[in-house]
């Protein structure tokens, strides 16, 4: 048993050790968040990423350090967290001192020139391979020059790069610096930031910020690329140091800025700062300063161009910094959802990561059946506000789903739930009553309804109708009150020409009604009962429709539409019933008269 336990422990130990992978085994592009991702710069813009163990002070120091490999080509680092396999005692690179970029000498007979210490001709140099200022041709008027030290004699043509001459012989390599031929600038190529000027029959490359060759100091930060979170600062004009910004900047220049002649506002034209940084020009120096604070989870996240990383619940996501809306963003005017029985709403667009341009919102056709009643009103108002127009008769081309009816609103076809015929409920009636009272048309129609009711009460048939149970129920129901508050409903209950004429003002009806009061009363009661039942049903239908929407516009439209239908139906029923009653009464009277005459 003990042997088995020992074997299990050994297997666990060795398997755990085998599975444990060091940070140095990862490539720079696949460095996990538990490790530190750094990089070192090779002259002429090349950058190599690496992955190493995370420490507490990774990047806190920010000191620029130079290293050299077997090819004697210096590389530049700025973090204290470097892989020991490359920068350790037995690593590939060995420490090297940062070259001293000194002031230009003032005792040069033929002017000065700038040459690269490593013999590089590219723009993206590093602090380990800076440009140094030296006397043109190595000739001085006494003393020694800095950068290209001489000890008697002069160089025989060309230019030396940081080399020492002794007794007229030069040691070191020649560079492709500015060479003159007969004092002409026609065949002289000056470095970036300098222009050719003839001085004493000699072509001299002078800085663009200064017209004289003396007193110019080369800023070491012109050739330093600091990582994001750091800015380059020069100390005494000799040493470049990447220090942490207060706002934790995230950009660094990728190209050496070209100083302009007159203003700082053009310094940032050729400076491309990384994500989260913006270029700031001050005192002739272009620097990349912080645009926003970078969350910790975004340290190793590379977002596409135009996007920045943000922390959402400790998860890094790439969000668009500034989205530009194209000129041809679609609206509901450009789509015809109503022709297919759908409604158009503007929804937020899902812009793909990396998209240069993307509309913030886009029109979307949706089914009304998937939306609640309260949303239908908002959809209708959205369509009306966007100015979407359909055909001449919107509902003639609209095909609403099953259970929905088309209602034209502001020349827009809106699919509303089809009303169901049920008995009036208190809640529905209350909802309709409150909706009708809130509308201006409903409030203005209350007085006309009251006057119509008082006029109708003066006639016997109206009095009989008011005494009937169905009429009483209709008048006491809030929904009936709401229905009568609309102009069309008021006309149907009190001032309808057909109903009024047939019930009280028709001559034959009056004559026959006077001879048979009970029959007239019962007929009037039946007519009023039928009209009241129709009005109650119509009011209930309106209340049911209004209960499914909360928007005032849609409720008013539905109420007006349903009330108009109810009014027409009630008037038709009342006219038909009254005519039938009158005909029956007339026939009965005629039969009685004929019988009496025949008997006599």
Swiss-Prot record:
Record keywords, A-Z: Glycoprotein, Phosphoprotein, Repeat, Sporulation
Superkingdom of the source species: Eukaryota
One of the Pfam families matching this protein, by short name: Dicty_spore_N
SMART domains: FOLN (SM00274)
Domain DSCP-N: 21-140
Disordered as annotated region, ranges: 139-178, 420-530
One GO location term (cellular component): glycoprotein complex
Localization per Swiss-Prot or TrEMBL: Spore wall
UniProt-recorded Gene Ontology molecular function terms: DNA binding; mRNA binding
Residue ranges with Low complexity bias: 161-178
Biological processes per GO annotation: spore wall assembly; sporulation resulting in formation of a cellular spore; stress granule assembly
Post-translational modification: Glycosylated; may contain fucose and GlcNAc-alpha-1-P-Ser.
InterPro entries the record matches: Dict_spore_N, Fol_N
Span of domain Follistatin-like: 184-206, 220-243, 267-289, 297-319, 331-359, 394-416
Transmembrane annotation, as ranges: none
This protein's name: Spore coat protein SP96
Gene: cotA
